[in-house]
Amino acid sequence: MGKAYYVKFETPEDLVNPILEAVRVASTSGKVKKGTNEATKAIERGTSKLIVIAEDVEPPEVVAHLPILCEEQGAAFAFVPSKQELGKSLGIDITSAAAAILDAGDAQHIVDQVVSSIAKIKGGKTDQ
């Protein structure tokens, strides 16, 4: 099965672990919002450092608005293959379709690296 229609670009495998690590570290040392609704609010308020969206969300309409909203608001965003892994990185026992890093805490250098890498993947467009 191909990627969901809302996945705007292919996240390289070597970038997935740093993204999940950034979420993991930021959730303990910074501030992270869990879930699609919280991520949406963070984008709209302009408080997100990085939005992380799972690629395996069913139905896809749940998160389909996030990449569009991120592009409109100039927010950095990235995709991870699994909502299960995203949930684990957030330190919760359930899946999470999306997350918003508001304060990276000790993960700031990882977030900066991810945002920079994503900008290059997207063709040099800067999101922040």
UniProtKB/Swiss-Prot annotation:
Compartment(s) of residence: Cytoplasm
InterPro entries (UniProt xref): eL8/uL1-like, Ribosomal_eL30-like_sf, Ribosomal_eL8/eL30/eS12/Gad45, Ribosomal_eL8/Nhp2, Ribosomal_eL8_arc
GO biological process: translation; tRNA 5'-leader removal
Pfam families: Ribosomal_L7Ae
UniProt cross-references to Gene3D superfamilies, sorted A to Z: 3.30.1330.30
One GO CC term on file: cytoplasm
Keywords linked to the UniProt accession: Cytoplasm, Ribonucleoprotein, Ribosomal protein, RNA-binding, rRNA-binding, tRNA processing
Assembly notes: Part of the 50S ribosomal subunit. Probably part of the RNase P complex.
Record NCBIfam families: eL8_ribo
The family this protein is said to belong to: Belongs to the eukaryotic ribosomal protein eL8 family.
Function: Multifunctional RNA-binding protein that recognizes the K-turn motif in ribosomal RNA, the RNA component of RNase P, box H/ACA, box C/D and box C'/D' sRNAs.
UniProt protein name: Large ribosomal subunit protein eL8
Gene that produces this protein: rpl7ae
